[in-house]
Design a protein with these regions (language model features):
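Hydrophobic N-terminal alpha-helices or hydrophobic patches in metabolic proteins across all domains
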Residues: 1-318
């Protein structure tokens, strides 16, 4: 292999994505210095200013749409200007992808929560989960803590890994950043909470559109793997829930089917109980110790896909 060919493969979309995956996994980036921390603060501040609960629902929907448009412009427009005007556009694009693949916050919080739960410290376990989810975690039982932790890990596989990688390969760094920003805003403005019931509808709608293909491909692979495992639970028709993203619910169902773990079921947000379809399997608290290993397996799967892409480029190079 010549030096020119090595550089061509290394700086290809698959090579850069592989480097970004490894960098995000092994090099720590403090949460307070990450751009998404600023994004969440800006989104929360903006919603506090323009989302007034005493206004009609139509005005709240319009305010939510304008807030979404503003946040996307504030994030994507400067990134596009820097990316287009930089002499080292590959490096800038790689940094944008690295930002979009941020998973350390959820991974560390769930890991510490699982550690505390294994030692019987339920309050500490609940506190760590509260930092990374809009759900009410104060009254969670051991089963609820375990199920929430696994669901957060599964959600991060879709939103923090596969969706940015897929959009990176299809549309470049700005597409990867855009789809990840939507996932972040969906967490800041969850329609499951009454105050964002109408304000967050535009974000939830665009999230469903952009995450349809990533959820479909991941769910298809997970269900295919589940077919070759013994004693997998039966897949029941998915029941739509207006207060929880159907796209995400479909992925959680497939994840539950693949790993034979109980997920879904009712949750609580801002004091309101929200019913969700339950997906059968073994109790989550019995399989919680394997959750980190499952996440690593999916990481290896993504790395394998990128290596296959690199090998394909090598075989079919001009």
């Amino acid at each position: 292999m010549t030096v020119e060919l090595f550089k061509e493969l290394l700086f290809s979309p698959f090579g850069l994505a592989l480097l970004a995956l490894l960098a995000e996994r092994w090099f720590p980036w403090p949460e307070q210095w990450h751009p998404f921390a600023v994004l969440r603060l800006m989104a929360a501040y903006m919603s506090g200013k323009v989302n007034k609960p005493d206004r009609p629902s139509s005005q709240q929907k319009i305010a939510g749409f304008l807030a979404l448009l503003t946040m996307l412009l504030l994030v994507l427009l400067p990134a596009a200007i820097v990316f287009a005007g930089a002499e080292v556009s590959l490096a800038i694009g790689w940094l944008i992808l690295l930002v979009s693949l941020r998973q350390q916050t959820v991974r560390q919080a769930t890991h510490l929560s699982e550690q505390h739960l294994s030692k019987g410290r339920k309050n500490a376990a609940r506190a760590w989960l509260t930092r990374v989810t809009w759900r009410d975690c104060d009254l969670l039982s051991e089963h609820g803590i375990a199920k929430t932790s696994i669901e957060l890990r599964a959600t991060s596989i879709l939103e923090s890994r596969f969706a940015p990688l897929l959009f990176w390969c299809l549309g470049g760094p700005l597409a990867a950043l855009g789809v990840r920003v939507l996932a972040e805003l969906k967490e800041v403005w969850p329609t499951a909470q009454a105050r964002y019931r109408h304000f967050g509808q535009a974000t939830a709608w665009l999230y469903a559109i952009t995450h349809f293909l990533p959820s479909f491909f991941l769910s298809l692979f997970a269900r295919t793997v589940g077919l070759f495992r013994r004693n997998t639970p039966k897949i029941e028709p998915l029941k739509r829930n207006p207060l929880f993203p159907t796209i995400l619910l479909s992925w959680l169902q497939s994840f539950s089917y693949c790993h034979k773990v109980t997920l879904g079921g009712p949750i609580q947000a801002a004091g309101i109980r929200i019913s969700r379809q339950r997906f059968g399997g073994r109790p989550a608290e019995l399989l919680l110790s394997q959750a980190a290993r499952w996440q690593r397996i999916w990481q290896v799967f993504f790395i394998t896909c990128l290596l296959i892409g690199l090998f394909t480029l090598f075989i079919y190079r001009p």
